[in-house]
């Protein structure tokens, strides 16, 4: 119903509501109980609440669920298998529920998790493993591959429900609450000199870091264009600069405060959609042509790499039109069902279209590390204007006001809205 009325997103007609649940107990030795300090509201949360997201991901979640996956907290309790954090430590949470979190022995992990790319875990649509259960992976004939080994299990009394992330999971609460639990592999210590309002951005900033490192953007001759004015777009601008990209960087945003943020984070040029964007493209050497029917098209010039951090029809159409021949388009926005998208120049310019999701194992400075570790280190050493991204913080009980600010960001001026228990 959110498609038809904003009241169904943040008003009394919304299906969201406050509930009282018992304090979460640790389900195993490798688990951590966390008191939530701040939790961001993500665009994917708004898309799901309003039912404007594609239903294609529905099998990879389980409901009812406590939302929230951009989590900053303080450790309250650790199991005996946890040695890298202690009660009192500030931590951020990787929300992905990969094979190890779901209770499987290493020999049973899916190929993505074996490679450290757990954001594409191939078993997130399956139940987890109570101790001693057979693995759910099936062979080509549909038979359970029993030789995959038993699960190490969780003490839930039943299998862990399907679901890709904390925040969209029936059994593991997200950060829109006072406390939550997470597996030790999901928990990362925050440096002492990173303030809370910056640390809570670790998850969305890591998406930008992951996209920059995986796409080869640091080797691009440029120019690079970043489209979008949300946390992921700003995180991508910051990631490009803090990780070492020195070429020309153009950022497209809509409102004055967003344009200022993009410049403060490292954009050489900031543009708004429409005439300014067109002129920026022409300045690269592109030539404009007008077909008999349809919008203006371009040849020559263009951007070597376009980061689309929106993922809708206008942004994808612009990305295809603005990319140079044999250029690359990286989609970091949660693109879903796109209607009336003309793909002519995808093939006519031999473009590469690549999507990235989440975070995982990265090659950085000669080491293999988690994206969160890269992001946290750079946040400590190069915070730039990151403190300006969290524009609104609401007490948890004012969640309706928080959702209104995030959903109607054009009026509120919100970039990132966070809840504080």
Which residue stretches match the model-derived regions?
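C-terminal capping/lid region of NAD(P)-dependent oxidoreductase domains
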Residues: 1-3, 296, 300, 330, ...
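Glycine-rich beta-strand-centered segment in the early N-terminal region that forms part
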Residues: 22-39, 54-115, 147, 191-193
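NAD(P)H dinucleotide-binding glycine-rich loop of Rossmann-like/cofactor-binding domains
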Residues: 58-60, 98-227
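Adenosine-nucleotide cofactor-binding segment
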Residues: 223-229, 241-314
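N-terminal Rossmann-fold NAD(P) dinucleotide-binding loop
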Residues: 233-234
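C-terminal substrate-binding/catalytic core of Rossmann-like NAD(P)-dependent dehydrogenases/reductases
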Residues: 282, 287-296, 300, 339-391, ...
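Helix-to-beta-strand junctions that scaffold the AdoMet/dcAdoMet cofactor pocket
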Residues: 323-324
């Amino acid at each position: 119903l959110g498609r038809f009325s904003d009241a169904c997103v943040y008003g009394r007609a919304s299906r969201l509501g406050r509930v009282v649940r018992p304090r979460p107990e640790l389900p195993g030795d490798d688990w951590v109980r966390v008191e939530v300090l701040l939790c961001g509201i993500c665009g994917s949360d708004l898309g799901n609440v309003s039912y404007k997201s594609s239903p294609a991901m529905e099998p990879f979640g389980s409901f009812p669920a406590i939302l929230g996956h951009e989590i900053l907290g303080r450790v309250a309790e650790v199991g005996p298998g946890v040695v890298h954090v202690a009660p009192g430590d500030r931590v951020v949470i990787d929300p992905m529920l990969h094979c190890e979190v779901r209770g499987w022995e290493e020999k049973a992990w899916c190929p993505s998790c074996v490679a450290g790319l757990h954001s594409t875990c191939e078993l997130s649509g399956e139940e987890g493993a109570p101790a001693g259960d057979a693995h759910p992976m099936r062979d080509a004939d549909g038979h359970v591959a029993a030789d995959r080994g038993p699960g190490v299990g969780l003490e839930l009394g039943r299998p862990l429900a399907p679901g890709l992330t904390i925040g969209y999971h029936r059994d593991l609460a997200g950060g829109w609450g006072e406390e939550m639990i997470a597996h030790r592999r999901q928990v990362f210590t925050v440096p002492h000199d990173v303030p809370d309002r910056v640390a809570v951005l670790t998850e969305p900033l890591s998406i930008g870091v992951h996209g920059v490192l995986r796409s080869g953007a640091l080797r691009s001759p440029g120019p690079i264009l970043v489209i979008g004015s949300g946390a992921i777009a700003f995180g991508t601008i910051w990631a490009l600069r803090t990780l070492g990209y020195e070429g020309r960087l153009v950022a497209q945003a809509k409102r004055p405060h967003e344009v200022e943020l993009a410049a403060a984070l490292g954009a050489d040029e900031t543009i708004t959609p429409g005439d300014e964007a067109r002129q920026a493209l022409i300045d690269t050497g592109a030539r404009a042509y007008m077909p008999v029917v349809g919008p203006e098209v371009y040849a020559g010039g263009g951007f070597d790499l376009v980061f689309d951090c929106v993922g809708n029809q206008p942004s994808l159409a612009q990305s295809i039109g603005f990319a140079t021949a044999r250029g690359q388009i990286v989609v970091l926005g949660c693109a879903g069902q796109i209607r009336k998208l003309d793909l002519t120049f995808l093939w006519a310019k031999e473009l590469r279209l690549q999507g990235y999701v989440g975070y995982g194992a990265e090659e950085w400075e000669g080491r293999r590390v988690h994206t969160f570790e890269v992001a946290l280190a750079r946040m400590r050493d190069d915070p730039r204007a990151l403190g300006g991204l969290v524009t609104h913080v609401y007490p948890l009980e004012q969640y309706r006001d928080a959702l209104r600010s995030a959903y109607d960001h054009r009026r509120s001026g919100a970039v990132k809205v966070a809840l504080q228990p």
